[in-house]
UniProtKB/Swiss-Prot annotation:
The lineage of its organism: Eukaryota, Metazoa, Chordata, Craniata, Vertebrata. Residues 333-377 form the UBA domain. It comes from Mus musculus. InterPro entries: UBA, UBA-like_sf, Ubiquilin, Ubiquitin-like_dom, Ubiquitin-like_domsf, UBL7_UBA, UBL7_Ubl. Interferon-stimulated protein that positively regulates RNA virus-triggered innate immune signaling. Mechanistically, promotes 'Lys-27'-linked polyubiquitination of MAVS through TRIM21 leading to enhanced the IFN signaling pathway. Residues 206-221, 239-253, 270-293 have a biased composition (Low complexity). Residues 18-98 form the Ubiquitin-like domain. Residues 200-313 are annotated as: Disordered. One of its GO terms (cellular component) is cytoplasm. This is Ubiquitin-like protein 7. GO terms for molecular function: protein-macromolecule adaptor activity. The modification Phosphoserine is found at S230.
Amino acid sequence: MSLSDWHLAVKLADQPLAPKSILQLPETELGEYSLGGYSISFLKQLIAGKLQESVPDPELIDLIYCGRKLKDDQTLDFYGIQPGSTVHVLRKSWPEPDQKPEPVDKVAALREFRVLHTALHSSSSYREAVFKMLSNKESLDQIIVATPGLSSDPIALGVLQDKDLFSVFADPNMLDTLVPAHPALVNAIILVLHSVAGSTPMPGADSSSRSMPSSSYRDMPGGFLFDGLSDDEDDFHPSTRSTPSSSTPSSRPASLGYSGAAGPRPITQSELATALALASTPESSSHTPTPGTQGHSSGTSPMSSGVQSGTPITNDLFSQALQHALQASGQPSLQIQWQPQLQQLRDMGIQDDELSLRALQATGGDIQAALELIFAGGAP
């Protein structure tokens, strides 16, 4: 076979419906060697040159052939790549573009800071709720996601993670310094006020911000409530907590939600109640209550059965119980739900459907993340 017959088909892993691109390997680069002597790193450069819009940098891709991730220092011969073979391109996580902080309305910010500063110094329950939120990794991550520019401001991140610094920077007198230098921190502090205000009563009611209904906070840019931050928050003001049947379905920002129509559906409250009941009932291994019998009693929390039984609920126990609850609710088979992704993984040479399903389940059906998980050996 002449060198001019050497070509490869290239397909982007995250665009399964896109046609393959034909990559003709240049003869002049081969010299005395056969095409099989090409290194994988050189092949990446050729692909980046061919697909400039989709692959701007060869360092940001991995190549997959017959279910194997190709190493840069190996050759085509090493992996048995022949003319006409299809190589799949897996794009690595792209670096996040720099986000500019949202502009700060200084007048509104001053009003919010005064409310927060007063509440921090006059209400121990409010102060504890604020610091509990900031010490919780998940809630802090949500604040970072909801506040453009915050992730690239190390000083602002340090302030949010230190109680003393937060108390100092939440002073209205600091605004003149913060607005030009750390606008993202100002927006984050205001977001903290809105978030905690939805779950902990503000001291006094003379401020328009304090008397504002909690539902209106969700309508503000970047605003969301941490209603489900921690069960321990019930210790502050139990009378102000809403019952599970009337609570807002989601307290996470939209950017943290599920992506893609093929991802898993959200867990319903009845399924969560069933899981909690299963996890806290000793007989749960032999009996699976139906979701229709859980979480609908008036004025009764689905946590009550777990509290009364005194059985400690571990993460593993809860995960197993949640699986039982989802199965009892008639959740479609994962193999049917993610059939297109499974077929795509098979096309790449990954024939272990059980491994693929676990990876897809862990990544919410994201094919690219599932591939990275499989090749990293991290599929559960």
